[in-house]
Regions:
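Bacterial Sec-dependent N-terminal signal peptides
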Residues: 1-28
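Charge-rich (acidic/polar
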Residues: 21-132
Length: 132
């Protein structure tokens, strides 16, 4: 029994140590902006805008936050890769269209038909070349 308790304590201790070594994705610097903005700040801003624009309910907010987090992280990583390989407007636009289209598809599961229709209409105004 004493061995089991010791093993559990060690396991919990090591798992906490491992988690502490990985910085939160929200504290990571947003590469595209030079003003010190973090990914978390961008997520907060997009979530606030989507909440107002789509009239998200309290039940939809956690799932929407996850969708937005995935999209912002994917965009941030894509910009990092583009900077390393040579970035231009066409590549950046292609990345934005791909990430935003995927975000719209992920949103479909959590939005009502009215909310989704409004989102698709807004998306098609911004990205007419998109295939939603």
């Amino acid at each position: 029994m004493k061995t089991l308790i010791t093993a559990i304590i060690l396991l919990v201790g090591y798992s906490n140590l491992t988690v502490a070594q990985n910085p939160s994705v929200e504290n990571e610097k947003f590469v595209f902006l030079n003003n010190g903005a973090t990914v978390g700040m961008i997520i907060k801003s997009v979530l606030k805008a989507d909440k107002q624009r789509l009239k998200l309910t309290d039940q939809q907010l956690p799932k929407a936050r996850q969708v937005i987090t995935n999209a912002v992280v994917k965009y941030n990583e894509g910009v990092k890769k583009l900077k390393a390989s040579g970035m231009n407007q066409k590549k950046l636009r292609t990345l934005a269209v791909a990430v935003e289209t995927e975000k719209v598809h992920e949103y479909k599961a959590i939005l009502t038909n009215e909310q989704y229709t409004a989102l698709v209409a807004q998306h098609m105004k911004m990205y007419p070349e998109s295939k939603v």
